[in-house]
A protein has these predicted regions:
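FIC/Doc superfamily catalytic core
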Residues: 1-235
């Protein structure tokens, strides 16, 4: 089943009465509240006298938090010191990963003006994100050519918690995902971005950096759809 067919199926289901009234009663108010909150957030961003100045710091904070999920230890102060080449500053070994996140975010936002979310953009973002990063699995911008898996340290393919699709399916699955991103549908934007993120992480198209690219896609989608004028929400 492709994501285009999934979109069609969801459209049909959303057009009917929800079989689980309890779930509908929980989801609809939460979705409405989230939509209102996004509207208020976008309004605040538009009201700032210099939103780009605010966003510049906000992006760096998000870069630190997102990279910390992957185990890095750098701080916002480290990022700023790196950017100005502060004298006497001791550079953390993993600062490159955090600074690359800032660069990938800024690059992606600029590219959206001429290139919508696509497999090509995803690969370009990954290339920026993984440039010069330590380890044997960086492969900037390259889709994986070997099987990966997710599990605790020392786990193998046989006892992994989750095994993504085999590498020969990755390109077609990403193509399906790209079609789903741009398909016209009645799926609310916040639900759709959740589906996009979940499917991207399920495909796990790279050997490393999937989590960070997936989180960047959320911000890119909200800006591409003009739900937010600036990337001021990270999930």
């Amino acid at each position: 089943m492709t994501w285009v067919s999934v979109a069609a199926m969801l459209n049909k289901r959303l057009g009917r009465r929800c079989a689980d009234e309890g779930a509908a009663q929980r989801v609809v108010p939460a979705l409405s509240e989230a939509d209102r909150a996004l509207g208020r957030l976008d309004g605040l961003a538009r009201s700032l006298p210099n939103p780009d100045l605010f966003v510049a710091m906000y992006v760096r904070r998000e870069a630190v938090l997102s990279s910390q999920i992957e185990g890095t230890q750098s701080s916002v102060d480290d990022v700023l010191a790196f950017e100005v080449d502060a004298p006497g500053w001791v550079q953390p070994a993993d600062i490159t990963e955090t600074v690359n996140y800032v660069r990938a975010m800024n690059y992606g936002l600029q590219r959206l003006a001429e290139l919508p979310i696509s497999v090509r953009l995803i690969r370009e973002i990954h290339e920026k994100l993984m440039q010069g990063v330590r380890g044997n699995h960086a492969n900037p911008g390259e889709l994986r050519r070997s099987q990966n898996w997710i599990g605790p340290g020392g786990s193998t393919l046989s006892d992994a918690i989750f095994v993504p699709p085999p590498p020969f399916e990755v390109e077609n699955l990403l193509s399906d995902l790209e079609k789903f991103v741009h398909a016209e549908s009645d799926i609310p934007a916040l639900i759709k971005i959740g589906l996009i993120h979940a499917q991207f992480e399920t495909i796990h198209p790279f050997l490393d950096g999937n989590g960070r690219v997936g989180r960047l896609l959320i911000a890119f989608y909200l800006c591409q759809k003009e739900i937010l004028i600036k990337p001021v929400l990270y999930l």
